[in-house]
């Protein structure tokens, strides 16, 4: 961004920063604290800490669009970094997306029950859906009766994520998750049945979170089209790495197999390089 500033660009970063230092090289920055929270997150707006009510993906997009529309010098070229928290753990969907994909059954990956034979380092990773994915923190089984307990050390964190919601957010959340919690407690799942139940819950929430990102990327593209920016702007859509969606029995990304190593990237370059894969 500093080089772009020197070339006459206005620069901005909005959303996830997740570094110990304040951003430099930006004319405007409004960043989440740490990796941020999905609900009612705190932002640091050019040094000033503020809590904003709402859902992080929507808020981050709102702030970016506000800068594009109201806060930049429209006589200058710009570079905007729009960094979403989603789909970072713990994959908390927006309340409007909670019922999406409810009837979808996701195919279990062929390597889901990987035994890691001959691969000691892989066997020691703490991101196994069966043994490391927390029922409360990751899978939202924070029952009101406080009967579901876990051994990962993350249970209290999971309940705190719920407690930071507004009453309206909690009401929508409870409407969706309370019946799931009730059924889960009645089923008393173990073994393979529990493992695959956890996988389905993980996938449902992950895809809902991705849906919110997709919708908000669409909001930005719609704005750029309506404002006449779309055909004069290079757009890069990417991530910091791939992710495990049950392959090798894992969630997260911290092991360099193909699924984690591959990094998605799309570039829209009007009038530039011809599209290809």
Question: Each PLM stretch: what is its role?
Answer:
Residues 1-277:
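Formylglycine-dependent sulfatase
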């Amino acid at each position: 961004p500093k080089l772009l500033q020197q070339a006459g660009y206005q620069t901005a970063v909005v959303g996830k920063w997740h570094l110990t230092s304040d951003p430099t090289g930006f004319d405007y920055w409004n960043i989440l604290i740490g990796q941020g929270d999905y609900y009612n997150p705190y932002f640091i707006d050019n040094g000033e800490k503020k809590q904003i009510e709402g859902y992080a993906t929507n808020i981050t997009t709102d702030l970016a669009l506000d800068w594009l529309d109201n806060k930049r010098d429209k006589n200058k070229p710009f570079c905007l970094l729009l960094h979403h928290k989603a789909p970072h753990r713990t994959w908390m969907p927006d309340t409007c997306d909670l019922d999406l994909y409810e009837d979808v059954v996701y195919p279990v990956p062929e390597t889901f029950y990987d035994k890691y034979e001959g691969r000691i380092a892989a066997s020691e990773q703490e991101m196994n859906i069966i043994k490391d994915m927390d029922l409360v923190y990751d899978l939202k089984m924070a029952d009101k009766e406080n009967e579901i307990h876990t051994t990962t050390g993350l249970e209290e964190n999971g309940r705190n994520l719920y407690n930071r919601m507004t009453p309206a957010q909690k009401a929508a959340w409870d409407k969706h998750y309370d019946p799931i919690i009730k059924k889960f407690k009645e089923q008393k799942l173990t073994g393979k049945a529990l493992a695959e139940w956890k996988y389905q819950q993980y996938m449902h929430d992950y895809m809902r979170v991705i849906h919110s990102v997709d919708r908000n990327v669409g909001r930005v593209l719609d704005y750029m089209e309506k404002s006449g920016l779309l055909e004069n702007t290079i757009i890069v859509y990417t991530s910091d790495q791939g992710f495990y969606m049950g392959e090798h029995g894992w969630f997260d990304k911290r092991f360099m197999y193909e699924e984690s190593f591959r990094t998605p990237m799309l570039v829209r370059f009007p009038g530039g390089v011809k599209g290809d894969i």
